[in-house]
Structures are given as structure tokens and as C-alpha cells.
Amino acid sequence: MSEDGSTLARRQLGKYLRDGREGCDLTLAQAAMLIERSGSTLQRIEKSTVAHLRDVDLDALCKIYSFDADHTAAMKGLAVQGNELSWWYEFGDVMPTNFDFFVGLEASAQRLTTYEPELVPGLLQTPAYASVLIRSVYPDDGPEEHARRVQLRIRRQTRITRKHQPATLNVILRESVLRGMIGGSKVMATQMRHLADMSTRSNVRLQILPFGAGFPLGVAVGPFVILEFGADRQGQAIEPPVVYTETFTGNLYLAKPTTIQRYHDAYESLRQNAMDPADNRALLRRMAKEYA
């Protein structure tokens, strides 16, 4: 079982259970009542945000939805995979509320397409840069707790840096990301060099949207990530793509196909106005020298 497979298994199981419920023309409340659980609990099961699905609940749902023996066996197989604890659960004590779901999606994704207008994305941050940002959010953390938060962020980066089947990362950073001082000139110099080095990886495409490009979409665009999960042997998507957006007060997951396409179109417009990868590296290395 791969470190990221448990999240996909939970998502697939949730989808099949939702399809089964809708096929029986049952509401969440009606199906939940039949298994003596709350509607919110069943909704979390269908949305794959329950870390451990009880066998008794799965057995009851399979019977209610009239799944045959093969279908039920497949559901139980997915449940076993989904119940396996992934690496990030050891960081549960320092994991922001509900962020484990995003980390699971990120660890499962085959391709991540992201735009950041203000900060270096977590997957490309150096430990020092991450430490400054995390300290700002959690100023009361003790040394050990703070170190674990930084460790969690850096651990996520192995999805991009590992040798075996690393995910593809497409990133556009607005020039303001390079100009905004985080932690002082030494931290910024190291971060600029790290970005330049990461951009040489075959699975990473990093581009800078210069100030001179203005606002290609006519409006200011907030940060977003498009997560895609690859295809099976028949060329069918293993899981539908998801867009994740984050704001000061919370986050949002978007899955409607037309919405996903709008974000792809937005990214393409930004990409067409961004610098070429080779020019990006030259700029990043020049800025590293300036900060140093």
C-alpha cells in the first residue's frame, strides 16, 4: 500500500457509497437513520473525511444499498486500504484543523498546478522560510511543537523530490513573491537559490509572472492549486480533479467540471504572460545574489 493510496481509497469508497444511496433514492438523513448514525457522520463518510470507517457501518450500508457479494467485497477492500494510517497522521498533534484532508489529496496527486501571488508555496519552501511563516501563525508554540510543524511542511515535499514517480509540479509565482521579505535577506537568498535549483528538475516547471505583465485576467487572482490524480490503463481519470483555494478565514474545495476548467483557463492565461523557465532561473539567481 503506497503512502498516498489510503486517501484515494477513501475517496473512491465514499463515491461508491454515495452512488449506492442515491440509487436507492435515499437522503443522507434517511440512510443515516437506517444505520443509527447521524446525517453529518454519513456525509463525512461519503466525503472521505472519516479517517476510520467502522465495519458495522459498512456492512449495514452495503445491505441497505443491495450491493451483491462482489460489490460488497470490493467496498470492504477499499475500506481496509482507507483505514491504513498515512505518514501524516503522526503529525496529528500539530496538523491544522481539517488540513489532513488536503495533505492526503496532495500526497495522492499525480500533477499539481498552482498559482501563488504572495508567498512561496509550501512544496517549495526552505525550512528557514517555512519556520518564519509558521512562527507568525503559531507564536505561542514551544520549540518542539514549532519544529514538528516545520518538519510536517518539509515532509510534504517528498511527493515532488522522491526518485520513484514524483508528482509533476507546475507553478506560477507573481513577482511579489520574490520581493516580499520573509525572515531577512539571508533567508530570502537561500530561498531564491532553492527555487532556482528546484526549477531544474524535470518534473517541476516554475515560472514568474512579472509586475510588467499587469493582471492578465483583469482582476487580482488569489492562490489556488489544481490537483489531478492520473488515469488508469483505459485512460480514465482515477479520481476527478479538485481545486483547492485558501483564504485568511478558511479554505474551499471545488470539484464542478466547469469550475475546474475555468481554473485551468486562468492558469493558461497567467502562463502565457509569465517569463520563460530559463529566464526565471536567471532572475532567481540574480535576486539570490542581491539578497546575499
Show where each model-derived region lies.
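Short secondary-structure junction/hinge motifs that connect adjacent elements
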Residues: M33-I35, D93-M95, A282-R286
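Hydrophobic protein-protein interaction segments
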Residues: R111-A292
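Short, functionally important structural connectors and interaction interfaces within domains
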Residues: R37, I45, T97, G104-A107, ...
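Basic, Lys/Arg-rich alpha-helical nucleic-acid-recognition elements, primarily the DNA-binding modules
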Residues: M1-V80, L85
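Short alpha-helix boundary/capping motifs
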Residues: S2-E3, T49-V50, D59-L61, D70, ...
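Short acidic/polar alpha-helix capping motifs at helix-coil junctions
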Residues: G5-S6, E22-L26, G39, T97, ...
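Short, charged recognition helix plus adjacent turn
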Residues: A73-A107, G235
